[in-house]
Amino acid sequence: MHRRTFIKAFTLSASVIAMGMSFGVQAAETIKVGIMHSLSGTMAISETPLKDVALMTIDEINAKGGVLGKKLEPVVVDPASNWPLFAEKARQLLSQDKVAVVFGCWTSVSRKSVLPVFEELNGLLFYPVQYEGEEMSPNVFYTGAAPNQQAIPAVEYLMSEDGGSAKRFFLLGTDYVYPRTTNKILRAFLHSKGVEDKDIEEVYTPFGHSDYQTIVASIKKFSTGGKTAVVSTINGDSNVPFYKELANQGLKATDVPVVAFSVGEEELRGIDTKPLVGNLAAWNYFESVDNPTNQTFVAAYKAYAKAHKLPNADTVVTNDPMEATYVGLHMWAQAVEKAGTTDVD
């Protein structure tokens, strides 16, 4: 090889190596954050906004200098409302993408699917939705409400004079761990208040269920036995046909109020809510909270939606799990700053 050719080849190789080192340094200058929410399937209606608000929050943190002097880099995956796929995506985020933390899941079945992966790989999950309790892990931050913070106070209200003095309870939910465990807790609570089993009805439907004609008719029949309330733990897009059927059959809140634990502003955005006035939802947060902090949060999300051309950007809303995602991301960022490291331990 001629000396000039050798020098050119050496220079080219050195440049390629330097470029590789540069890319490696650039990669090391970011902190990867996993976002694991269903962007398709039956839970997409509820989970997609959590992805959006997580990305907004990351932009907000990065605009203020990031964390430990590094920008946050989001890694978004779509488990597609498929519970085993949640576990696969969690393993991908932790093992391949090397994220420092994951914000994700909605249903308890998805959380229970990923929990062994986070404990095996010592990952960190922030879970933003109400849950049934009876679980604790050093690898999970549960930022939603447990039954004693949401379900029991809501039912106590329904039993009060202000809440309608309900004597009978129709417990309607999607068929998985959260509704069944919550209703087991509620049944025990109702027993302690003197409510007998004959005055408690439990009905469960699959994820994605869309025909509520027979169930709403059953609610109407059950309500003839005394003052009745419905406690709904329906999840995902099934909420839309359920509330539409209530309106179709003329079941008003003044006759049989419905209190929901898994429906908020987002799930009701696409239906006519006028016939549903008086029905209830129980959450830690609502968009209508009137204080400067929330006004800033809501305005920021609406501006983000328009700037990023999110679907129906002019009518976007905020809800409890979105607020919990926002708070959770800031909480994690502040903890990392204080600890000086992203290490889970």
Question: What kind of region is each of these model predictions?
Answer:
Residues 34-53, 77-84, 106-109, 174-180, ...:
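Extracytoplasmic "Venus flytrap"
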